[in-house]
Amino acid sequence: MASSYKMSEQSTTSEHILQKTCDHLILTNRSGLETDSVAEEMKQTVEGQGHTVHWAALLILAVIIPTIGGNILVILAVALEKRLQYATNYFLMSLAIADLLVGLFVMPIALLTIMFEAIWPLPLALCPAWLFLDVLFSTASIMHLCAISLDRYIAIKKPIQANQCNSRATAFIKITVVWLISIGIAIPVPIKGIETDVINPHNVTCELTKDRFGSFMVFGSLAAFFAPLTIMVVTYFLTIHTLQKKAYLVKNKPPQRLTRWTVPTVFLREDSSFSSPEKVAMLDGSHRDKILPNSSDETLMRRMSSVGKRSAQTISNEQRASKALGVVFFLFLLMWCPFFITNLTLALCDSCNQTTLKTLLEIFVWIGYVSSGVNPLIYTLFNKTFREAFGRYITCNYRATKSVKALRKFSSTLCFGNSMVENSKFFTKHGIRNGINPAMYQSPMRLRSSTIQSSSIILLDTLLTENDGDKAEEQVSYI
């Protein structure tokens, strides 16, 4: 009995030990599985954060930095280079300011929302302000392109009337109108504000929702994109047609032999044979022999024979500029069309997949942002003066080149009282030695007075003989 009891006790003890061992093994195995699961989740989280960081770095390097840097170069070039300070380039400067503000205030915050998975990470009051700046600067960039195309077409179609209004003050008025139109399109965003989730105010996505901004999305797409697009396309084809027509007329114009009697207006030198010096004289039958001495006839005719060549060269340069403008329009369509078409579809299509459309908008808006970085490249790399300025600014050289400084010095040295022959001799002796080529030279009369507004008036520069094509190319705007 005692022996049986001892055997039973030993058996119970063995079973208890075995049970505890099994329980320990099960707990250990379960703990190991949970540990592996946690480690796997942590690994996936780290990998997800790594992908987000890589995506952010790619956007910063490929889009934001070039946008900021390129537009700063454009602003510096127009502000510092005297040769670039004319009305058309002030439009470019304003366009560069709009694109620069996109790179400084819009793109970084948009990138921040990507890193936080579309959750607004900043104070809620800043959300409407950021949306307003986004719409404002992007619209201003598009409106500047539209205004440039209109201004260019008018300048080619009616050059005399356009040149009369082509002052700095007029350019600033046009730029102000462009910014006011952009503000008018974007102002409904901060007025209406965004709809806040009362239950969870920290889980807010900063975006224009269909329920609250549906009508604005339709209006904004039409006013900020499709209307300017229509204007740009129409003016572009009208510009091409006008240039082709002018090129045809110049090409098929019968050659004319210029004589001393075919020149309606010339700038005269100060001559001792006259009682009072005349700068500009209208030629009539009673004074022709006095005003144009026979000794200068051949020189005058040689200078006037280049007018036709310069007209053809100018039209050729305008055609090349229009091709560059075509590249700008093509890139504009390529970069902004997907966003605005998707935005319009999201506002009008109730049966469409809203989640898919919102995802597409997040992608397409960055393609539109790229346009702000491309604009300064396309508009300025076709211009030699911009390229030279960019090269100096990149090397932190913000001073004018030696040739430009010398040109300013010679411009102040050459006087109106001297004859054209005397000024030409002075320039030939000193100008080439200091690095000034004939294409860079402008007569004191042109530097002092504005362009005479008449198709029958011809301005005789001091040097217009050998490098006429280069001079015309340098004077024609490539915008």
From Swiss-Prot:
Disulphide bridges, residue numbers: 127-206, 349-352
Motif DRY motif positions after renumbering to this chain: 151-153
InterPro entries recorded: 5HT2B_rcpt, 5HT_rcpt, GPCR_Rhodpsn, GPCR_Rhodpsn_7TM
Membrane topology, record value: Multi-pass membrane protein
Effect of disrupting the coding gene: Partial embryonic and perinatal lethality, due to heart ventricle hypoplasia and impaired proliferative capacity of heart myocytes. Mutant mice that survive into adulthood have a decreased heart weight relative to body weight. They display dilated cardiomyopathy with a loss of ventricular mass, due to a reduction in the number and size of cardiomyocytes. The myocardium from mutant mice displays abnormal organization of the contractile elements, with an irregular array of sarcomeric myofibrils and abnormally wide Z bands.
Annotated GO CC locations: cytoplasm; G protein-coupled serotonin receptor complex; neuron projection; nucleoplasm; plasma membrane; synapse
Cytoplasmic side: 79-89, 151-170, 239-323, 382-479
Positions annotated with a glycan in the UniProt record: 29
Motif (NPxxY motif): 375-379
Subunit structure: Interacts (via C-terminus) with MPDZ.
Family: Belongs to the G-protein coupled receptor 1 family.
Biological role stated in the UniProt entry: G-protein coupled receptor for 5-hydroxytryptamine (serotonin). Also functions as a receptor for various ergot alkaloid derivatives and psychoactive substances. Ligand binding causes a conformation change that triggers signaling via guanine nucleotide-binding proteins (G proteins) and modulates the activity of downstream effectors.
Protein's recorded name: 5-hydroxytryptamine receptor 2B
